[in-house]
UniProtKB/Swiss-Prot annotation:
Name of the protein: Homeobox protein orthopedia
Gene Ontology terms for molecular function: DNA binding; DNA-binding transcription factor activity, RNA polymerase II-specific
Region (Disordered): 81-114, 277-369
Protein's organism: Drosophila melanogaster (Fruit fly)
Function: May be involved in the development of the central nervous system.
PROSITE patterns: HOMEOBOX_1, HOMEOBOX_2, OAR
Keywords linked to the UniProt accession: Developmental protein, DNA-binding, Homeobox, Nucleus
Coiled-coil spans in chain: none
Gene name for this UniProt entry: otp
Length: 409
């Protein structure tokens, strides 16, 4: 009853047949999948009747089931479906094989990196030193000699030429003088130093000049030699400068700066304070005399005579005698007195040169009395006020040094 209710309510099931009907169905199926009509139906009816004792199934229902089940449970359809699935699987396998073949071809097309041996590199470098652009015959010869292909040799030469051009460009930039510097630049060291410092009218030639310093020549010695030739300084200043430079080279830069440059700076600043005195081609002072020559003449002689001598004595290690200091002071006051007696007649440069050695050789005896007079001291103070401060320090330093040396000896 339950089977009949299920069959009537739910409808026929696929392949819901007894075992005997299934065996008869499989045995009686022809090549086209059609069921025979005659005896098979009787057998099916008998089989269905045998089961009908517990509730038989009419023959028509069995036929309908067979018809539906025959269309659904056909072996040929199952076989065809199986063949179709296998065909799809074969297609997938073929596609996979094709992809593998393509990947192998790509790997074959990809070039392997060539590793050159040292012997091959030496041969290639030797050929590159001969020519940078070898022809096809030379490349083939090189390839046969080192065991490479002509294309590899050609590529190596291309890379080597590119490297050579890049290296040449960088080396040219660093080797070219002034390539990395601005175009205008700065003037060379020592060019026209005296013209810049003291003016073109004071001294015509440069201290160091524009030429390069040669090997083995002291540049400071050469510069001071040119300056001494072109300046109107005395021979004592010349010897003082040379001895100062020699002692500086022997004792060090500190003593050289203390002696040589101080003497040079003091004497030049005295010369510059005179004004109007300029260097001619022969090294003698010109004949032009400024209107304030009377006030400057009493200041000019001490640096030209006293200071170089004192600096020379200091360089030689000898203390300056006391009578020389007295002679210098008396000479100064004597000149002051002469200028007071003759204010309207300024001496010419030749007369000044003649008066200088006479006053040094024969100092007057009465000058010691005027040294202590109040008027002379006032004039001395006014003169010292007229002299710049950096020039006033030089005589005091010399007197302090002489006093110390006298106390030692």
């Amino acid at each position: 009853m339950l089977n009949n209710l299920g069959a009537n309510v739910l409808g026929p099931k696929d392949c819901d047949l007894p075992k005997a009907a299934l065996t008869a169905l499989h045995a009686g199926v022809n090549s086209f999948g059609q069921l025979p009509v005659g005896p098979n139906l009787a057998d099916l009816g008998g089989g269905a009747g045998g089961g009908g004792s517990s509730g038989g199934v009419p023959v028509g229902g069995g036929v309908a089931r067979l018809h539906i089940s025959g269309g659904l449970c056909d072996n040929s359809n199952a076989l065809n479906g199986g063949n179709g699935s296998s065909g799809n699987g074969n297609g997938n396998n073929n596609n996979g094989n094709g992809n593998n073949n393509n990947s192998m071809q790509q790997q074959d097309q990809k070039r392997h990196r060539t590793r050159f041996t040292p012997a091959q590199l030496n041969e290639l470098e030797r050929c590159f030193s001969k020519t940078h652009y070898p022809d096809i015959f030379m490349r083939e010869e090189i390839a046969m000699r080192i065991g490479l292909t002509e294309s590899r040799v050609q590529v190596w030469f291309q890379n080597r030429r590119a490297k050579w051009k890049k290296r040449k460009k960088t080396t040219n930039v660093f080797r070219t003088p002034g390539a990395l510097l601005p175009s205008h630049g700065l003037p060379p060291f020592g060019a026209n130093i005296t013209n810049i410092a003291m003016g073109d009218g004071l001294c015509g030639t440069g201290m160091f000049g524009g030429d390069r310093w040669s090997v083995g020549v002291n540049p400071m010695t050469a510069g001071f030699g040119q300056l001494n030739q072109s300046s109107p300084l005395s021979s004592s200043l010349n010897s003082g400068l040379n001895s100062g430079i020699n002692m500086g080279s022997a004792l060090g830069a500190g003593s050289y700066q203390h002696y040589g440059l101080n003497a040079l700076g003091d004497s030049m600043m005295y010369q510059h304070s005179v004004g109007g005195v300029s260097c001619g081609p022969s090294g003698s002072p010109s004949a032009t005399t400024p209107p304030n020559m009377n006030s400057c003449s009493s200041v000019t002689p001490p640096p030209l005579s006293a200071q170089p001598n004192s600096s020379q004595n200091e360089l030689n290690g000898e203390p300056m005698p006391l009578h020389q200091q007295q002679q210098q002071q008396t000479h100064q006051h004597q000149q002051q007195q002469t200028h007071q007696h003759h204010p309207m007649a300024p001496p010419t440069p030749t007369q000044q040169q003649q008066q200088l050695p006479q006053s040094m050789q024969s100092p007057s005896d009465g000058a010691n009395d005027t040294l202590h007079s109040i008027a002379a001291l006032r004039r001395r103070a006014s003169e010292l006020n007229a002299i710049p401060s950096y020039l006033q320090m030089a005589p005091h330093n010399y007197e302090h040094y002489n006093s110390n040396s006298n106390s030692v000896y």
